Amino acid sequence: MDAAFLLDWLNLVLRWAHMIVGIAWVGASFYFIWLDNHLHAPLDPADAAKGIGGEVWAVHGGGFYTAKKFKLAPEKLPPDLHWFMWEAYTTLITGFLLLCLVYYHGAEVALIDPSVLALTQGQAIAIGLAFLVVGWLFYDWLCRSAFGNDDLVLGGLLFLYCAAAAWALCHIFSGRGADIHFGGMLGVIMALNVYFVIIPGQRELVKAKQEGRTPDPKFGLMEIGRAHV
């Protein structure tokens, strides 16, 4: 069994894994957006007295479901609390491994186009990684700066940055290489936002309840540094 055969199988496995966990991540995100947009006042006054701010009733797959959202936090946390984070982490990990396998290992074929810019494999990889890292650092700084206090300004600056990044990538890499690094930059921003902003905020909510403190509402709204949502 030669190395090329194994690399083909690894490519296939990573592609399927990346697609599956990516669907799980996006699906979970869309579900909670839908859930938040369809919450209504609890039907049972006792639920409102317990701090429940809204609920949704649904029927699916032959069963009835109800989902309830607290205004801040319950009086007591359950022993089993599900965290929605590994969907994002595994999407980032599988995507990065796939990027390394297809575009960095095979840079001469998939990433470098001498008619666009003559690069060595090492130079191309370094530039590609820099775009992924700098994209996150710029986004994080922008959200934590004064610009993050105005959604319109923030959105406009991010749009301009993305346009500049797309232009630069198209003048550095092949068409495929530019496309995948632009998408990868956005994916890294989203996944690291989960890791560095959203999940730490949720951990603080849980920690406050475990220590008997009143949770800070800003963590529940995921507004650390303002627009990190």
Regions found by a protein language model. Give the residues of each.
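A short, hydrophobic C-terminal helix/tail in secreted or cell-surface proteins
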Residues: 228-229
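Polytopic transmembrane helical bundles with strong interfacial aromatic enrichment
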Residues: 1-225
